[in-house]
């Protein structure tokens, strides 16, 4: 394959450049590239990324195993596959996404032709999290490249093996003036956020998201914030309980619960609670093993990313047990391995910290209810979650919940897998996020939608000053009949 000259690999590394040097280099290159980085160049860039990822898949699996023992199959399904799917989807649809759009004519400007054009925002910053460090670095990169931007990626320092590999992959595929990786801790993020990027894409906690938005306000950079929250699951009386249990176990305990759209807690109708709990525990045993020793040995179970997060999760568990929570499954931990086994708790009360903080770990509170209105009120009294899940065979029950709650997305009789749908926007509401990612929505997030109005035979100049008697009459007619 012949690579366009703009994508020829340079014998240089972002490691040898400061954040400011990388930004300035990309700013100059982005200006020079404007209007010239068309569909052929963008698809070539996406092909390079895809080929490099596929060739280095074993290294990706090894890096994530080294960082927090993520299982190989989970890496393929939740880290690599979504990025490759995003690339393929962008390649298939990019011509249509980039195409100028005609806009309906308006009588007030009769004689003109209106349209929309999508231009790159310019130099963009992607700040990636640690929980899905590969997916959430390269997924947004696909959208940014499809839109024609230059990009700086700041991977999380909490997954150092993966961060180093991300830098290596980027340097193999791209020149620094198109895509660069800048590694470092929070101080490096602050240094980057002080620069006047044209768009910032951040994935992380609401607390840090507010800091990112505050920094962006100083340069008036646009932002996409993919945050989090306590995503509730509601199980109705007519739910298929085995199906609900399978989905919840996979959605909650994959990645050891360290997923922004994982079910945070479960509301289950009291009339089916005991039966559901029994099925749920059996499903955990089937997937991960019957006891602590088996779950520790499981090749399909990840670890907590670091000691700080392990201690936070263990503190939530200890607090809940001390205040009367009942352990239905699990409850054991091993600090030496940063291991918290799949844990299900009942008798969870408002006095417990687990009821208020985003868990972001393998603790699953089960909360019984009698009246769905009380559940809806509780959901609406809190911050708007990134996701909400409903398990029910009753369409009226489902539609009532969907209509009366607000969340970034809703999954009905499934959990988490909506992230994989390339034609759906992915994003939150207020505290759980701003803006959308994936597919055309990601493309538009990294694009400026530019309106263009062209005069063909417009008569609007008849309304220009000086405001003679005739012009005033025309203005009066315009206001009267076109308002």
UniProtKB/Swiss-Prot annotation:
Binding-site residues for NAD(+), renumbered to this chain: 204-209
Enzyme active site: 226, 260
Name this protein carries in UniProt: Aldehyde dehydrogenase
Enzyme class: oxidoreductase
PROSITE patterns: ALDEHYDE_DEHYDR_CYS, ALDEHYDE_DEHYDR_GLU
Assigned protein family: Belongs to the aldehyde dehydrogenase family.
Source species, domain of life: Bacteria
Enzyme Commission number(s): 1.2.1.3
High-level lineage: Bacteria, Pseudomonadati, Pseudomonadota, Gammaproteobacteria, Pseudomonadales
UniProt keyword annotation of NAD present: yes
Listed pathway(s): Hydrocarbon metabolism; alkane degradation
Gene Ontology BP, a term: alkane catabolic process
GO molecular function: aldehyde dehydrogenase (NAD+) activity
């Amino acid at each position: 394959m012949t690579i366009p000259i703009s994508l020829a690999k340079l014998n240089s590394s972002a490691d040898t450049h400061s954040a400011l040097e990388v930004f300035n280099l990309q700013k100059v290159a982005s200006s020079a590239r404007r209007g010239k980085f068309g569909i052929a160049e963008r698809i070539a860039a996406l092909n390079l990324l895809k080929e490099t990822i596929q060739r280095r898949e074993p290294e990706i699996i090894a890096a994530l195993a080294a960082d927090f023992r993520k299982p190989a199959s989970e890496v393929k399904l939740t880290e690599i596959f979504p990025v490759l799917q995003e690339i393929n989807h962008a390649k298939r649809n990019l011509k249509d996404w980039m195409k100028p759009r005609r806009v309906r004519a308006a009588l007030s400007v009769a004689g003109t032709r209106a349209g929309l054009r999508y231009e790159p925002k310019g130099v963009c910053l992607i700040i990636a999290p640690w929980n899905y460090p590969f997916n959430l670095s390269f997924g947004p990169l696909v959208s940014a490249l499809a839109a024609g931007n230059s990009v700086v990626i700041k991977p999380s320092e909490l997954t150092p093996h993966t961060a180093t590999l991300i830098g290596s992959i980027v340097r193999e595929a791209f020149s620094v003036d198109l895509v660069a990786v800048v590694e470092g801790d929070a101080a490096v993020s602050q240094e980057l956020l002080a620069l006047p990027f044209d768009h910032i894409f951040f994935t992380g906690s609401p607390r840090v998201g507010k800091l990112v938005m505050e920094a962006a306000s100083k340069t008036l950079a646009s932002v996409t914030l993919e945050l989090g929250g306590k995503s509730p699951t509601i199980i109705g009386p007519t739910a298929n309980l085995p199906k609900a249990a399978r989905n919840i176990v996979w959605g909650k305990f994959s990645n050891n619960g360290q997923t922004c759209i994982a079910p945070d807690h479960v509301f289950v109708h009291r009339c089916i609670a005991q039966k559901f709990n029994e099925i749920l525990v059996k499903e955990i045993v089937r997937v991960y093993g019957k006891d602590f020793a088996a779950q520790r040995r499981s090749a399909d179970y990840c670890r907590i990313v670091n000691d700080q997060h392990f201690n936070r999760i263990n503190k939530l568990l200890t607090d809940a047990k001390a205040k009367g929570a009942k352990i239905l499954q699990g409850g054991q931990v091993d600090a030496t391995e940063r291991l918290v086994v799949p844990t299900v708790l009942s008798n969870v009360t408002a006095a417990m910290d687990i009821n208020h903080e985003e868990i972001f770990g393998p603790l699953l509170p089960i909360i019984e209810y009698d009246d769905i209105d009380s559940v809806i009120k509780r959901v609406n009294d809190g911050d708007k979650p990134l996701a909400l899940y409903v398990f029910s065979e009753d369409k009226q029950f489902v539609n009532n919940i969907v209509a009366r709650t607000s969340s970034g997305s809703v999954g009905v009789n499934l959990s988490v897998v909506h992230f994989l749908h390339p034609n759906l926007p992915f994003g939150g509401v207020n505290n759980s996020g701003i803006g959308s990612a994936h597919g055309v929505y990601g493309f538009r997030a990294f694009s400026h939608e530019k309106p263009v109005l062209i005069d063909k035979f417009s008569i609007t100049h008849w309304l220009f000053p000086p405001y003679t008697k005739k012009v005033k009459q025309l203005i009066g007619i315009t206001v009267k009949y076109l308002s």
